[in-house]
Amino acid sequence: GGDIDDLKEVSIPEDLFESSSGFNENGTAQFIAQVWDRAGNSIVGSVSDSILNIDQTLPIGISLELTSSNSINPDMVIPGDSITFQLNTSENIEAPFFVINGDDYENAIGLGKSWMLVYYAEEADDGVIEFRVNFNDIAGNPGKPISEALDSKTLIMDGTPPELSDITLFTSNKY
């Protein structure tokens, strides 16, 4: 208990809120409270300054493109190369979160529906570059994580220098 001026947290069940008159996608909601005490006295508060924007639509990853800076083979990455991840979504999102070969990257740049991250492959282990992109729309609705490029392109890290073995020299010179 406490005075009428005390702040109280009230929860409205999801199904009750969604079935209320005027609830619709892209709509807004404001709240007003009516409170009764044990003696039956009541008071109606003023309309809340807070406006709730209703957004239940999940964002969709429209495309994710991978581009290697390797000029000899665009499907390979070697030390010194970079990989550009270009993400496009169905609606404006917060900055996406990348996990590349088990490491977290939160430094994507972009705005709205288009985001890019440049990954420098210096420390990557040899093999396929594995990744997952997590993203939420502005309302916080999560998109389905993306773990492959739209065209299913994969990039392979090869940081092992070539070796020569069993070299035999011969000459046709008589001398």
Question: Model regions: which residues?
Answer:
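Flexible, low-complexity linkers/stalks enriched in Thr/Pro that connect modular domains
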Residues: 37, 48-67, 148-172
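Extracellular recognition modules
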Residues: 30-36, 130-136
